């Protein structure tokens, strides 16, 4: 599984509806509205790097209101949530 973090700058008028539209895209596991230089952070989870390109270029970037994106591929995940699920004994 390939994970990518996508930072998104949006048109101000698109902010109220873009989060839901991003979350509904196939390949998008999570979408967050954030503070700072970017408006949204999207977590993409797909089988391979080609899938990341498909999601970012052909789905995310095609939504109305997207100004620009910045994509980072994850090398490793160190999420506490992931570790807890690995060692869970079902309680």
Question: Could you tell me what each predicted segment is?
Answer:
Residues 1-91:
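A compositional/biophysical signature of low hydrophobicity enriched in polar/charged and small residues
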């Amino acid at each position: 599984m390939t994970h990518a973090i996508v930072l998104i700058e949006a048109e101000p008028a698109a902010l109220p509806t873009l989060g839901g539209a991003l979350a509904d895209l196939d390949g998008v596991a999570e979408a967050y509205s954030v503070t700072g230089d970017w408006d949204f952070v999207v977590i993409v989870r797909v089988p391979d790097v080609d899938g990341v390109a498909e999601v970012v270029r052909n789905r995310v970037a095609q939504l109305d209101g997207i100004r620009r994106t910045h994509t980072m591929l994850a090398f490793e995940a160190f999420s506490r949530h992931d570790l807890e699920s690995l060692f869970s004994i079902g309680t």
